[in-house]
Amino acid sequence: MKIGVFCPIGNNGWLLSENAPQYMPSFELNKKIVQRAEHYGFDFALSMIKLRGFGGKTEFWDHNLETFTLMAGLAAVTSKIKIYATAATLVMPPAIVARMASTIDSISNGRFGLNVVTGWQAPEYSQMGMWPGDEYFAKRYEYLSEYVQILRELWATGQSDFKGEHFQMEDCRVSPQPQAEMKIICAGQSDTGLEFSAQHADYNFVFGKGLNTPTAYAGINDRLKHFTDQTGRDVQTYVLFMVIAAETDAEAMAKWQSYNDGADVEAINWLMNQGGKDTKSGADTNIRQMASSVSPVNINMGTLVGSYEKVAAMLDEIAEIKGTEGILLTFDDFVQGVEDFGERIQPLMTSRQDIVAEYQPVTPLEKSA
């Protein structure tokens, strides 16, 4: 089972709460997190793209780094961990992204991959005059299909003459080409999104569901399998969870309750309003899950709260879900969270014993000695 870290490229990570750690994103912060993640055997690091935040008292995601330049920097200061940036495909031409990806492939010596997103929050793009109108919601996967086909052509052959509804290439060239196969991630939970991933992605990115219900998302894997049976492709799942861990279940749950008590209502209302504007994609999209009123304080991602032992056991449950190749983790406190994962959680995971054998966890007794 692969483990990844979802880099806090935006302020305050993934908690819309006045009671959560408040911090600004920086290269130094992300470098520290990813280097420590690499030390503990994390397999990959992924950063999102966000061009406008949600406001509120915490100014949630109003402050964001840029994903490609950040991950290029991280590629240069790491040696083993896989690095993924995210392409905002509405504002980044595919030929430019193909060349940027090839460059980071060179920096990382073949450790780079790409997450592609269609875009869902209109103000991110309308502020630049680049939102194509709400009719885009109905055709965004057709747009992304053309985009990915061009990427694959350029990476494989260095040249594209692709002609489609949205893009027209005329002897477009990219060289040098990537030295390693470029893996593509796409988030899909609706049937349309899953069908797209089955056709074009290497990994399908989904949200975990609920509080301490680690296997509740498993039905998405079954639906993805339905579509991959039709395409004949092997597409595995990367699933997102937040970890809030402590010495005891009670301590961890108290932190979770505090974050909920301090929820940034204004920022949450912005999220819910924007998430409801796509009326074309159905009720089962990842955006609809993000904007749900059930647990908006951490955008409704699956949440694992408990003692180190309990969290380790729940992560092992996820590892048993057929079709899941990796777990992407966020933490309430990223710096401490990565350390706690490496020292206190991962050594207890049956599914990660091969990784633990490669480094020496420092026991609590040794820490205090």
UniProtKB/Swiss-Prot annotation:
GO biological process, one term: uracil catabolic process
Keyword vocabulary terms for this entry: Flavoprotein, FMN, Monooxygenase, NADP, Oxidoreductase
SUPFAM superfamilies: Bacterial luciferase-like (SSF51679)
Catalyzed chemical reaction(s): uracil + FMNH2 + NADH + O2 = (Z)-3-ureidoacrylate + FMN + NAD(+) + H2O + H(+); thymine + FMNH2 + NADH + O2 = (Z)-2-methylureidoacrylate + FMN + NAD(+) + H2O + H(+)
Family per record: Belongs to the NtaA/SnaA/DszA monooxygenase family. RutA subfamily.
NCBIfam families associated with the record: RutA
Name of the protein: Pyrimidine monooxygenase RutA
Gene: rutA
